[in-house]
Amino acid sequence: SIKALLERRIDGIIFIGDNSDIPLIQSIAAQSIPIVTGDRKVGNIPSVTFNNKETVQEMVDSLYKSGCRKFMYVGETPTGQSNLLNRYNGYTDALKKYSDTTSVIFLEESLHGDKLKTARRLFTKKIITSLPDVIITSNDLIAQGIISAAHENGINIPNDMQITGFDDSLSSAYFIPSVTTVSQNIDELAKRCFSMLMNLINKKSAVSSIIEQNIISRSSAKINI
C-alpha cells in the first residue's frame, strides 16, 4: 500500500488514480514529499494532463458540421476528477455556440464501477426513450455497452444513431461497429511524469504540462478532422 511505501521514506511518488484518492494526495504533498499526478490535476500539485476539453469541443464541432443536431452526453459523474470534468465541460461549452441544437446529459455514479453493464442498462430499462443523432461518452466501455444494447433493440449504429467513446481501449478497434474514440499517448504521459518527478527530487523546478490527444474516426461516428 501507499502508506507502507511512505514508511520506507521513498524519494517521491507518481500518482495516477481516481477522485477517492485526493485526500491521500493532499496529505502526501503536505509532508513535502515530491509528488506528481498524471491525467488529472489536484490543486497546485505538479501534473501532466491531456487536453480533454479541447478534444471534446473539436469532436462536437465536427459532428455538428456533419449534420448532428440532437446531442446526448453519457458519462461518469465528474465530481473531483479534472479529466472527466474537462470532457464534460468541453461538451457543454461547444454546444453553447449552436442555438439550433438540443442536448441531454446523463451522469451516473455507478458508471465509475461496471461501465459496460450500466451503459447497457440505459437501453434495457428504457432510460433513453428518444434517440439523439449522436451520443458522446466519457469512456470506451460506456460506448461499447450502449452499442451492444442498441443492436439488441434493432438500432443501427451509425445509421440510426452515432456514438463516440474516449481513451481508445484495445477492443474498440475490433468492436462491431468499431468505436470512434480519442487516443491518449500514455507513453508520453509516463515519460513526462518521471522527468517532472526527478526535477522535484533534485530540487529543480517542475512545470505542469498538457499533452494533445488524437481523435480516431472509425465506424460508430464519422468525424472529419
Residue ranges and their predicted role:
Residues 1-61, 127-128:
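Alpha-helical recognition/docking segments in bacterial nutrient-uptake
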Residues 11, 68-71, 133:
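Short acidic/polar active-site loop segments enriched in Thr and Asp
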Residues 29, 96, 151:
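Anion (oxyanion) recognition and catalysis
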Residues 48-58, 74-96, 101-122, 136-144, ...:
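Hinge/beta->alpha junction and helix N-cap segments in small-molecule ligand-binding domains
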Residues 60-70, 213:
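Nucleotide donor/acceptor-binding cores
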Residues 70, 101-104, 157-162:
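Short acidic capping loops at alpha-helix termini that bridge into adjacent secondary structure
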Residues 123-225:
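Flexible loop/turn connectors
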